[in-house]
């Protein structure tokens, strides 16, 4: 079974070879460019961050999807929250999220980031990072595999391609 990206490339090459030009909508081009040039900022808080590093290594190679890790929130448009979020770290998470450029997306990685995980009943743990920032994609697991993270990123790319216009208006921010 062929990947969806390869089917799109075949369709594009067939159109160009048959007609010599391509007709499309500006919204589709913007969605394609945004989805294929994500710049994630790591927010690794616990053991899930190790799996995130593995997904960026040569075996899985997130670079082939156009993703380039950025050290600064002002240069990134995707935040990957990986690990247990504590009450003390929650204001820092929100501050980093507010510094990111628009449009911005959040991927919650692992049981702890999704809902508190193993430490759910602890007094010091936030029961899901979606209480602090709006989350676009949840990746389950403890810890989730690198394949699960790649799949979550591909789902986020599909979501980004469905958005229209220059302003990201698919959800309300807090």
Swiss-Prot record:
Which enzyme class?
translocase
Primary location: membrane
How many and how are cofactors bound here?
Answer: Binds 1 [4Fe-4S] cluster.
What processes in GO biological process is this protein linked to?
aerobic respiration; electron transport coupled proton transport
Listed under catalytic activity are: a quinone + NADH + 5 H(+)(in) = a quinol + NAD(+) + 4 H(+)(out)
Q: Report how it sits in the membrane.
A: Peripheral membrane protein
GO terms (molecular function) for this protein are: 4 iron, 4 sulfur cluster binding; iron ion binding; NADH dehydrogenase (ubiquinone) activity; NADH:ubiquinone reductase (non-electrogenic) activity; quinone binding
Print the keywords alphabetically. Answer: 4Fe-4S, Cell membrane, Iron, Iron-sulfur, Membrane, Metal-binding, NAD, Quinone, Translocase, Transport, Ubiquinone
Query: What cellular-component terms does GO give this entry?
Result: plasma membrane; respiratory chain complex I
Task: Give the UniProt subcellular location, in the record's own words.
Answer: Cell membrane
Query: Where does the chain bind [4Fe-4S] cluster?
Result: 47-48, 112, 142
Q: PANTHER family annotated for this entry?
A: NADH DEHYDROGENASE, NADH DEHYDROGENASE [UBIQUINONE] IRON-SULFUR PROTEIN 7, MITOCHONDRIAL
Subunit composition and interactions: NDH-1 is composed of 14 different subunits. Subunits NuoB, C, D, E, F, and G constitute the peripheral sector of the complex.
The name under which this protein is listed is NADH-quinone oxidoreductase subunit B
Annotated organism of origin? Rickettsia africae (strain ESF-5)
Task: Print the organism lineage.
Answer: Bacteria, Pseudomonadati, Pseudomonadota, Alphaproteobacteria, Rickettsiales
């Amino acid at each position: 079974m062929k990947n969806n990206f390869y089917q799109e490339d075949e369709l594009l090459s067939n159109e160009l070879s048959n007609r010599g030009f391509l007709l499309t909508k500006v919204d589709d081009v913007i969605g394609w460019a945004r989805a294929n040039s994500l710049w994630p900022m790591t927010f690794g808080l616990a053991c899930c961050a190790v799996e995130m590093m593995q997904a960026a290594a040569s075996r899985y190679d997130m670079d082939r999807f156009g993703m380039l890790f950025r050290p600064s929130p002002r240069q990134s448009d995707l935040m990957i929250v990986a690990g247990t979020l504590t009450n003390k770290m929650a204001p820092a998470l929100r501050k980093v999220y507010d510094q990111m450029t628009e449009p911005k997306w959040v991927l919650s990685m692992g049981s702890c980031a999704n809902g508190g995980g193993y430490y759910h009943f602890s007094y010091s743990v936030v029961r899901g990072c979606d209480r602090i920032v709006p989350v676009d994609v949840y990746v389950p697991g403890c810890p989730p595999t690198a394949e699960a993270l790649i799949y979550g990123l591909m789902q986020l790319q599909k979501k980004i391609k469905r958005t229209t216009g220059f302003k990201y208006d698919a959800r309300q921010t807090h």
